[in-house]
Amino acid sequence: MLQSSSPSYVLMAGMDECIRMLKERGEEIFAEYTILLDSARKRLQGLRHMKLMRTKRYDPSKLVISVKNTVASDSKKTFNGRELYRNLLDKYHLQAEMAAGYYVVLMTSPADSAEGLERLISALYEIDQKLEEFLPVSDGDSRDISGIQEVSEAQEPVYSSYEAEEKRGEGTERVRWADAEGRVSLEYTYLYPPGIPLIVPGERISAQTVKQIKAYEGMGFDIEGTEQKGQIEVLAHE
């Protein structure tokens, strides 16, 4: 929180205590945290079907677990990020930061204990083992999530958001996602978290984005931003 018109005195006191603790013991705290985190990351590299992801430049405190090309043991259907998110929460009482089509993001901090990280690691291995029992390793077997792209393509900007709002007077209508391709949006569309828009007012909706949104809906994700579920408001004559 950088600024607020309604400051929380509990939060402010907590921030003061955090500053004091880091000033007095910061080096010690982060040294211990780094050891725990490095150990956890090394152990998670042993997952067989789920994978701990990393890039050239990454924040090591965030554990990104990919479930791409895995299937659920009971249904033989694709096992997606939302299912891993719900599994961790409902069965293991572990709260992930967010879920997407292919992955979940798990936040860690110096406040996490060795016992807490051990709970997480054990839960992930237990889930992975269940998948393993029903999913033998096969190099030629691809189980991609149809319609989901890890990076969304940019839409064609037709109007600015302000101009799109001004165009409302010329007529609007609501269409189902199946009929949205090529139409100019008047609403934001996004998944939360992370809250990054898939569609912005004034953009022409692409076929790939429609496919992506329908795939997310099929996996049980809530599409935010639109007034009516399963529909989006568009310009009537565009």
Which stretches of residues belong to each language-model region?
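Active-site C-terminal subdomain of aminotransferase-like
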Residues: M1-V71
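Solvent-exposed, flexible loop/coil residues
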Residues: S6, T209, E227
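Generic C-terminal helix-cap and adjacent flexible tail
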Residues: E133, H237-E238
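Terminal helix/beta-alpha structural elements that buttress the NAD(P)+-binding lobe
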Residues: T226-H237
